[in-house]
Amino acid sequence: MNVQPTKYHGLVLDLMPNIRLMQGFGHFLFRYVNGPVLIRKLYSWWNLIMILLQYFAIMGNLVMNTGDVNELTANTITTLFFTHSVTKFIYVAVNSEHFYRTLGIWNQPNSHSLFAESDARYHSIALAKMRKLLVMVMVTTVLSVVAWITITFFGDSVKNVFDKETNETYTVEIPRLPIKAWYPWDAMSGVPYFFSFIYQAYFLLFSMCQANLADVMFCSWLLFTCEQLQHLKGIMRPLMELSATLDTYRPNSAALFRVASAGSKSELILNEEKDPDTKDFDLNGIYNSKADWGAQFRAPSTLQTFGDNGINGNPNGLTKKQELMVRSAIKYWVERHKHVVRLVSAIGETYGAALLLHMLTSTIKLTLLAYQATKIDALNVYGLTVIGYLVYALAQVFLFCIFGNRLIEESSSVMEAAYSCHWYDGSEEAKTFVQIVCQQCQKAMTISGAKFFTVSLDLFASVLGAVVTYFMVLVQLK
């Protein structure tokens, strides 16, 4: 079956580099492809089988080397490290429809002519940040893989074996491979060794990229959401100035209906008295409830007007189209905020369970790494390996928490922005609008890990606290 080329919009277009990389590394995302889907599916299944076979080989090595505590701890850390990759690879495959739904939420090109410049500016800021995040994470991932493979050639390639008969621990030479794993063939030298080495290099690159690309998509969603909230806060003050023209005399009120960006003085709405047939202002592009929110919203979305001819109904002599623009601006703000709330809800539903699995695995892994770090006595291969594991694991957790925390801060500050604007100069509609906004935004938007925790910097501190607690228990049990 072939997929015809389509023109993408919204988040799908913004995140297309991320989506293409995820598809390139084998993720089960087949909706945004051109050409035969069957080849894509075979490629994804082949990657899944190869990743699982290597993961089972790592687990086999863990099961077969349980005699020595240090060896058991090191193998457990390695197994937990790659558990992230396997779980996220499978998670994206199982929940691909949720990813499609979240990506498709922002495909409606809703905008408002008065705030189009602000919308475009914050969208470009979000796009730049998302691309920068993708580049930084991918460069870090590739450098980590290179460092992992490079450090393999330093130090002794041995493992500790505990002899139950003599109650002593001795070392045994093992293949010089990036990852300790059990294979049904002898990988000490020759063709089996080179095959095993290439296989593990592939596994390192693909497994780490698969996990990190899924995480980058989650963080990009949060970045986009935060910039949308910045946009809503930024247009709050001009929105109040506009609304004041409905029932309060404002000198030079016509200046409010001119394009302020790039020094332009062109009118957004032409004088309908001179040219009554002009149709320069189209409300169709501004949040139509039926089109944007589905058939369950049956309330009419038309804007209310007052006065006989739209001129004598307000003290500033606004035309009918100007009145519609003011009221549509308030509608735009409310519907855009609802849109953001809907996006945040979809993000939590899509990635919440993956966050829960990640945090559970990371807590155990970080505890064992902290225990291993106490045995570092020099800056050798062992010390660099443990430090690398520790920094990488902490960076993954911190990445989630910093963006989740920013979402909380940005959504909380919406109420402050609404209260700080000149709402007392606005119309009665605007005052009611500000009151509703303050009530609605009292509770910050959050992303939870399957309802068990909230992703924030407090979670990062809690994880560190739990690691220290478990570490002290392990030290006492030593």
UniProtKB/Swiss-Prot annotation:
Keyword Hydrolase: no
Glycosylation sites: N167
Extracellular side stretches: 65-73, 155-187, 365-382, 476-478
Topological category with respect to the lipid bilayer: Multi-pass membrane protein
InterPro entries named in the record: 7tm6_olfct_rcpt
Gene Ontology molecular function, alphabetical: odorant binding; olfactory receptor activity
Keywords: Behavior, Cell membrane, Glycoprotein, Membrane, Olfaction, Receptor, Sensory transduction, Transducer, Transmembrane, Transmembrane helix
Protein location: Cell membrane
TM ranges: 44-64, 74-94, 134-154, 188-208, 344-364, 383-403, 455-475
Keyword Ribosomal protein: no
GO biological process: eating behavior; signal transduction
Tissue specificity statement from the Swiss-Prot or TrEMBL entry: Found specifically within most antennal and maxillary palp sensilla, as well as in a subset of proboscis sensilla.
Record note on disruption phenotype: Impairs both honey and host odor attraction. Leads to DEET insensitivity.
Cleaved signal peptide residues: none
Note: The atypical heteromeric and topological design of the odorant receptors appears to be an insect-specific solution for odor recognition, making the OR/Orco complex an attractive target for the development of highly selective insect repellents to disrupt olfactory-mediated host-seeking behaviors of insect disease vectors. Odor-evoked OR currents are independent of known G-protein-coupled second messenger pathways. The homomeric Orco channel is thought to be a cyclic-nucleotide-gated ion channel that depolarizes the olfactory receptor neuron.
UniProt record similarity statement: Belongs to the insect chemoreceptor superfamily. Heteromeric odorant receptor channel (TC 1.A.69) family. Orco subfamily.
Function field: Odorant coreceptor which complexes with conventional odorant receptors (ORs) to form odorant-sensing units, providing sensitive and prolonged odorant signaling and calcium permeability. Orco is a universal and integral part of the functional odorant receptor, involved in the dendritic localization of other olfactory receptors. Plays a key role in preferred attraction of females for humans over non-human hosts for blood feeding. Human attraction plays a crucial role in the transmission of dengue and yellow fever by the mosquito.
PANTHER family: ODORANT RECEPTOR, ODORANT RECEPTOR CORECEPTOR
Protein name, as recorded: Odorant receptor coreceptor
